[in-house]
Structure formats: C-alpha cells, structure tokens
Amino acid sequence: MSESRKLFIKTYGCQMNVYDSERMAEALGAKGYVLTEVAEEADMVLLNTCHIREKAAEKVYSDLGRLRPLKVARPDLKIGVAGCVAQAEGEEILRRMPLVDLVVGPQSYHRLPDMLERTEGGARVIDTDFPEEDKFEHLPERKALRGPTAFLTVQEGCDKFCAFCVVPYTRGAEVSRPFARLMAEARALVEKGVREITLLGQNVNAWSNDGRGLGGLIRELARIDGLERLRYTTSHPNDMADDLIEAHGQEPKLMPYLHLPVQSGSDRILKAMNRKHAAEQYLRLVERIRAARPDILLTSDFIVGFPGETDADFEATLALIRAVGFGSAFSFKYSARPGTPAAEKPELPAELCDARLQTLQALLGEQQRAAQAAMVGRELGVLYEKAGRLPGQMVGKSDYLHAVHVEDPGARPGDLVRVRITASGPNSLAGERIGV
C-alpha cells in the first residue's frame, strides 16, 4: 500500500468516539495512511458515528449523501462508517448507501486494516460482532498526540439499561481494562509529553480490576511523575463508591470537576427511565461529594419530554437543578431510539417539549453564567493547550475545565501556570498569568 494515502475521519458525539477515532487512525497509520483535514483529498473517509439521538443518526446519512459526488468522481475512494450507528444499523447502512464500502462496530476497530484490505477487490465488508479478544491488545502503540492532554479509555459498555438509551446494545456489557495495561499506557502517554489524562468509559466509575475501583486507579495514576492532572467521565450516580468520593478530597491531581448525569428530578420519571435511584439519593450523593471537595464544579445531563412526563415531573427537575446549582449541563428533548423500552411509549407533543427545554436551558444558563462569574478574581491553574487567535495569546483549561484565554507571549502548549481570572464570558474566561 502506498505510503501517501490519506485518511479523513469525522467524529460525532462523545469523548469516547474522539479516543476511538485516534486509535483507528493509528491502526490505519500502520498501513500507510496519514490524516488529512480535507475530505476531498482523502483516499479513505471514515465517519465515526453517534446513535444516542435520532438527529445524530440521520445526520450520518445526510453526510454520506454529501460524499456521493466524491465517490462518483473517484470510484477508488473508500468510505467507511464506524461507531454506534454502524453497530445499531449495520446492514441497513449498506442497503441505504451503496457508496459505503465498510461498516465497523466499536468493538472491532482492531480489525479495520484487514477489513479495508478486503474492500480492495470490490467487496463490501461489515463487522459488528462483539469479539472475545480485547481490541486494545491488537491496536498499535499510540503515537500521534495532539497536545498535552489525552483520553484513556478504561471501561467500555453499560449494564444499566436505562429505558431511553442504546448504549448497552451498541457498546455491549460493561468491561474493565486491566490495571497493569492502563498504567503502562498512561506512563507511555506521559513520556510523550502528556500532562493531563481524562479517563473514559460509558460508566467510567464502574471500572474495577485487580481488587481496585476507580478511586484506587486514580491514586496509582497520580503517582506517575510528570502527570499533573486527572479527570474522568462519564459517571453513573449508583457507581460513586466511597473510595472514589474520598479521592476527590485527598488527591490533589484529581481536578475539582465532575460530570454526574441525573436526567430528571422526578422520582416517577427516574423509575420509568430505569435509573435505579431517586432524586433524594442524588441530592444526598451531591452533599457527600461536596463534603469531600467543597469547591467541586458539578455538571450533568437532562432529558425533557420523556414519555409520561407531567408538569409536576418537570417542576421536580427544575427544583433539583435549583437545589444542586450546576456549573453547566447538557440538555435535550427526548428522542426515541428503536429497540429501547421507552420507544414503545407514546411521545409528548413537540411544542410542549420545546417549551420545557427552553425553560430548562434558561435556568441552566443562569447557573452557568453565575458559576463563570464566580471565578473572577480567583487564582487558578491553567494548562495551556494551544495558541489563541490573538498574537501572544494562549488558550488552556482551568482546574474546573473552563477554557481560559491568557496573554502570555513566549509560552507554549503544555505549560501549566497560575492565572488570576479577570473576566468571564458565556463559554470562557480571561486572565493574567501570575506565576507557575
């Protein structure tokens, strides 16, 4: 295979997909492919997809349609669909989109080079199995790092079976990667210049291996010289073990930020969602987390318009939001996903869902602006990730995951500095460097 072949990857959805796209690029890099940011010049286009909402899935088909002129002009162009839409729809993608050469599910990325080779003879290839072998054992060593931060998948899959969610069907059962392999990969990342690692999993705090839970893993990772920061996402409230909560108060390298989805503040809706916890349990959990780390910034996920949601249910969600005070949150109208239990229930009127979402987002936006404004005057650690748009400007992330713009000529990505926050905006902060 020619060393000059180019690969374009479009990534949809969660951080796990970002990580998976990096690993697929590395797997194909071993076959001579180099990344390009221009689809028109690529020899292979790979869409790494998200199936969590209907709009995300339909966007994939729309984007595939836009690739048709490229395929017509260059029949040798290879087009692949990866990720959760690939896993969920499989053969349907090949049926609807004749231009697609291969379809690969999240658990089969290590087979991608072989699949691509099989398409060279004109075959259309699909692999959406859940293989017994560990895909991570068959992927090459990570090489192309884009900056001082990196994702590290520690856990995949989900056993929770929330009534609205496709993840258990597209990602499979919960599987924890071995402790020793994670430590080795983390050390290798640090040797390549990484200073912050975010641990990933569909239910990352369900990770367990070798007698350790996620709190124990974090404590061991924190002992790696040169690794300055740790984060993890996404968590389920039912898997917030005591040891993990204690780590937030005891481990300085674990950043004071936690994404803890709750979805609703109504016990009736939480039960219908099969979340297996009540609103009061979530509130007590928040109290325990803040007792361990009082300055922690909490974010969450919310769904409005779940089948059967009444005005009282929605008001209960607003009450929970007011009680917690979130730094930010992702919020969506309910989207029925085929094959999930909730998809069989009658949906609420779209106008009602739109109105509830607008009300919810107004409250969340108010809390986010307040959280941003509260940072003004504080001194925070900021890890520079890239140059800003203005001359001499750097952009990095604060301890609380805020984007921070700092005028700091001569600084470089990877510098970890102290910054006094001088201004807050809707989605970022500005500050001045005061030290290291």
Swiss-Prot record:
A cellular-component GO term for this protein:
cytosol
EC annotation from Swiss-Prot or TrEMBL: 2.8.4.3
Q: Which SMART domains match?
A: Elp3
Enzymatic class: transferase
| UniProt-annotated binding residues for [4Fe-4S] cluster 2 | 158, 162, 165
The TRAM domain covers 373-435
**InterPro entries cross-referenced by the UniProt entry:** Elp3/MiaA/NifB-like_rSAM, Methylthiotransferase, Methylthiotransferase_CS, Methylthiotransferase_N, Methylthiotransferase_N_sf, MiaB_methiolase, rSAM, rSAM_horseshoe
Q: Where is the MTTase N-terminal domain?
A: 5-121
Annotated catalysed reactions: N(6)-dimethylallyladenosine(37) in tRNA + (sulfur carrier)-SH + AH2 + 2 S-adenosyl-L-methionine = 2-methylsulfanyl-N(6)-dimethylallyladenosine(37) in tRNA + (sulfur carrier)-H + 5'-deoxyadenosine + L-methionine + A + S-adenosyl-L-homocysteine + 2 H(+)
> Is-annotated flag, keyword DNA repair?
no
- A Pfam family per the record: UPF0004
Q: How does it assemble?
A: Monomer.
Q: What's the protein here called?
A: tRNA-2-methylthio-N(6)-dimethylallyladenosine synthase
Q: What gene name is given for the protein in this entry?
A: miaB
